[in-house]
Amino acid sequence: MADIAKLVEELSKLTVLEAADLAKALEEAWGVSAAAAVAVAAAPAAAAEAAEEKTEFDVILTGDGGKKIQVIKEVRAITNLGLTEAKALVEGAPKAIKEGVSKAEAEDIKKKIEEAGGTVEVK
């Protein structure tokens, strides 16, 4: 037990940088990773945060509202698609216009498409 007390005393004298270097050296010597245990423990918390507030949204065109030409023009402006691609997207509704965008951008796209006469769903 005297050896353990002596070891604790010596380790207590280490700076943070020296302790980090010690941890890396022990990981290499023993072939283990201290980060793996931390990542497993943190995973449920991260999943709970994702469920609380979604940060990426998909904008889905659900219909052209009878104003296909105006909606095609707006889809082209938003997505930088060519005329035939934008027309195929509008005619193939429901289809995603943009995926993985911020809430503000999704709401902006929704507003523009609805002003053109189309119907949009943000998921």
Curated annotation (Swiss-Prot):
Q: Which residues form a coiled coil?
A: none
Xref: Pfam families: Ribosomal_L12 (PF00542), Ribosomal_L12_N (PF16320)
Q: Does the keyword Ribonucleoprotein apply?
A: yes
UniProt protein name: Large ribosomal subunit protein bL12
| UniProt function note | Forms part of the ribosomal stalk which helps the ribosome interact with GTP-bound translation factors. Is thus essential for accurate translation.
GO BP annotations listed: translation
Q: Which InterPro entries match?
A: Ribosomal_bL12, Ribosomal_bL12_C, Ribosomal_bL12_C/ClpS-like, Ribosomal_bL12_oligo, Ribosomal_bL12_oligo_N_sf
